[in-house]
């Protein structure tokens, strides 16, 4: 209780994506990290659960004994929320697709590498990051298969972290094929590939909501009868 008031009911589900912590430099990233932590503090009183929809970090790779330097405040706040009993679900994005078992073991947070169905209050949700879904973007899809392959992860581990992280940061900011992102402009409902993906999924099964990130563009679009596609935007633009 606080000042004698009854405890707030935890009835809200929160979604966030594409924080890309780590870029363009530590100082700029720190500003966004502080804002994100403040937001987590605001929602912790009534959060039934929290979904992090990928690209929390602009780069993340787990060696057996090493994880990327930095992000201590963000990770500490996530640990605090988990210790308080709030469920958190993490979907890897195209920038943190090399997430291993660190979040699972350290925070007891399940990590998903593809869209997953959830049911809340009688509503069916399909939730994920959003990269590589729908038609088109074939170059990125081929690249993702290579990067996500266990052999690629094994090979990358042989790079010293100072070299591996610097190389990955360069690719992250310079190569659009790897980032898998278009310019952050609305392409129209017929051209937005996550809208097309949602409509095709509805041909075989009804979903009340599709929740994705990746596009860095907030959207809410009706994709069918009683079915809505929502994009969470980002924490950069």
Would you name each region that the model predicts?
Residues 20-21, 57-58, 96, 132-133, ...:
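Short, solvent-exposed loop/turn segments at secondary-structure junctions
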Residues 58-82, 180-190, 194-210:
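N-terminal short leaders/motifs
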Residues 1-6:
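N-terminal amphipathic/basic-hydrophobic helices that include classical n-h-c signal peptides
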Residues 130-193:
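Active-site-proximal loop/helix segment associated with metal-binding centers of metalloenzymes
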Residues 7-14, 118-126, 223-228:
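Beta-strand-turn-beta hairpins that frame and shape the catalytic cleft
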Residues 108-113, 126, 131, 137-146, ...:
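Conserved beta-sheet core of the metallophosphoesterase superfamily
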């Amino acid at each position: 209780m606080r000042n004698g008031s009854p405890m707030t009911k935890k009835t809200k589900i929160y979604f966030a994506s594409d924080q890309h912590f780590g870029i363009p430099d530590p100082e700029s990233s720190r500003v966004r990290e502080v804002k994100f932590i403040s937001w987590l503090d605001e929602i912790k009183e009534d959060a039934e659960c929290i979904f992090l929809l990928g690209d929390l970090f602009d780069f993340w790779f787990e060696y057996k004994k090493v994880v990327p330097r930095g992000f201590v405040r963000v990770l500490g706040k996530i640990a605090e929320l988990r210790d308080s009993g709030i469920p958190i679900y993490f979907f890897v994005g195209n920038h943190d697709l090399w997430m291993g078992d660190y979040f699972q073991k350290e925070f007891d947070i399940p990590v998903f590498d593809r869209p997953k169905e959830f049911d809340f209050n009688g509503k069916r949700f399909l939730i994920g990051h959003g990269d590589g879904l729908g038609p088109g973007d074939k170059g990125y899809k081929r690249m993702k298969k290579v990067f996500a392959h266990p052999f690629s992860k094994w090979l990358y581990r042989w790079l010293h972290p100072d070299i591996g992280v610097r190389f990955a940061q360069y690719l992250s900011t310079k190569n659009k094929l790897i980032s898998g992102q278009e310019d952050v402009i609305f392409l129209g409902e017929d051209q937005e590939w996550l809208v097309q993906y949602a409509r095709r999924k509805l041909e075989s099964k009804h979903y009340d909501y599709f929740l994705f990130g990746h596009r860095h563009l907030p959207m809410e679009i009706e994709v069918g009868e009683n079915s809505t596609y929502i994009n969470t935007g980002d924490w950069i633009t």
